[in-house]
Design a protein with these regions (language model features):
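Short beta-strand-to-loop acidic/aromatic patch adjacent to the donor-nucleotide binding site
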Residues: 118-135
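Short alpha-helical segments and helix-capping/turn motifs at coil-helix boundaries
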Residues: 15-26, 105-110, 142-151
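Short His-Asn-centered micro-motif
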Residues: 3-4, 41, 124-125, 163-164
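Conserved catalytic core of nucleotide-sugar-dependent glycosyltransferases
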Residues: 131-202
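N-proximal low-complexity "stem/linker" segments adjacent to membrane-targeting elements
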Residues: 1-56, 85-86, 93
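Beta-sheet entry/capping signal
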Residues: 37-38, 119-122, 158-160
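Active-site-proximal specificity loops/subdomain of glycosyltransferases
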Residues: 46-116, 141
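Short, solvent-exposed loop/turn segments at secondary-structure junctions
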Residues: 7-8, 45, 127-129, 166-169
Length: 202
């Protein structure tokens, strides 16, 4: 479960997803084994917050996860240093990948997930609750949606799942093509993550 955020209110959304997860577990087969992990990449500059606004979670939330990884600006710098050792990208290119803002935070999470050997990631919007409103006659009803369960059941058979609660697709940083990273490499990547917003044709 992943959040790229700069809003303190993400903790309220996270709490709603914990309740969503507790309901989802009831619908899973008894022998379905899942290790649930939380990755939070936070931006303290976005709304002038501090790291503890994101890292100070209630024990009830902490107990739901097998592992929690927080990623702030210092983590991005350490990622750049580690990648510099064995990457063919230079420091400027690496800084563009882990830049401030939404895309840089998502990229930091992707790298941390690789380092932590995650099988799947579910990016969730930090300002959308797992709810939907429907109109029934003259009344509007708020109903829970099975966001986590839906993705969990589909992702083992897919390269990528996406939905209305998953946030925007990360902008891809500008990296010049060379013999190590060709236009065809980028095309394969784009096709793997393509959807109605981002695909090879547009």
């Amino acid at each position: 479960m992943v959040f790229a955020t700069g809003r303190m209110s993400f903790k309220k959304v996270l709490n709603a997803y914990i309740k969503n997860w507790q309901e989802a577990k009831k619908k899973l087969p008894a022998d379905y084994k899942i290790s649930l992990n939380l990755f939070v990449a936070y931006d303290t500059d976005y709304l002038k917050t501090q790291s503890t606004d994101y890292t100070n979670l209630s024990q009830d939330i902490v107990d739901q996860f097998d592992q929690i990884v927080f990623l702030g600006a210092k983590n991005a710098l350490r990622s750049i240093e580690r990648l510099e050792e064995y990457s063919k990208l230079d420091k400027k290119e690496l800084r563009s990948i882990f830049a401030a803002g939404y895309a840089g935070k998502r990229n930091a999470i992707l790298f941390a997930a690789l380092e932590n050997h995650m099988d799947y990631l579910l990016f969730l919007d930090d300002d959308e609750y797992p709810l939907a409103v429907t109109k029934s006659k003259e009344v509007c009803l708020w109903s829970g949606q099975h966001i986590i369960l839906s993705h969990l059941m589909e992702i083992p058979n897919a390269d990528y799942t996406n939905g209305l609660h998953c946030g925007y697709i990360s902008p891809i940083p500008q990296i010049p093509f060379n013999e190590d990273f060709t236009e065809d490499d980028l095309r394969v990547f784009i096709e793997a993550i393509s959807n109605d917003i981002l695909n090879w044709d547009n």
